[in-house]
Amino acid sequence: MKRLLLCIVALVFVLAACGNNSSNNKDNQSSSKDKDTLRVGTEGTYAPFTYHNKKDQLTGYDIDVIKAVAKEENLKLKFNETSWDSMFAGLDAGRFDVIANQVGVNKDREKKYKFSEPYTYSSAVLVVRENEKGITSFNDVKGKKLAQTFTSNYGQLAKDKGADITKVDGFNQSMDLLLSKRVDGTFN
């Protein structure tokens, strides 16, 4: 059972991230210098999935999973930290072989990448300052400033709801802007 679970998790990473249908990406992957090293794209700023611990070591659920997969497959790992909006561009350009970061499935990504069954489930929440009275639901964000990454599902949700988007590199930056009152909220 443990081996089956590990194989399923491996498929999540390999199919979801490496399964790009473009021939350019296949060429980039096949020209990788070290076939025993898996180049991993990740944010490194999205706890508890991918972040730095007190010793500044990259850790988190997604990092632990990809390490377990690599151990099982006798692969070395090379982690490449990048912003969310650069994640798929790095994969497409061949800078990464796989993404180990929370990735939501959407129609555009399904057209370009292959996905296995999801291994985590989450839903969007609206994050506002504790004393915020004017924003209590998703429908209240029309015309409000929300800090979002442009290419995330949450960024698309904010656009769909009519929010004024302030571009950020990740969730930590969203929270900094929210706490400093430079934005009204963020979806996450």
Locations of the language-model features?
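Bacterial signal peptide processing site
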Residues: 19-22
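Extracytoplasmic small-molecule ligand-binding "clamshell" domains
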Residues: 30-103
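C-terminal motif of bacterial Sec signal peptides marking the signal peptidase cleavage site
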Residues: 14-17
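Acidic, polar ligand-binding/catalytic clefts
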Residues: 76-140
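Positively charged n-region of N-terminal signal peptides that target proteins for export
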Residues: 1-4, 9
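Short loop->beta-strand "edge-of-pocket" segments that line small-molecule binding or catalytic clefts
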Residues: 38-42, 138-150
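Ligand-binding cleft/hinge of the Venus flytrap
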Residues: 50-54, 66-75, 142, 151-171, ...
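Short helix-initiation/N-cap motifs at beta->coil->alpha
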Residues: 63-64, 79-90, 133, 151, ...
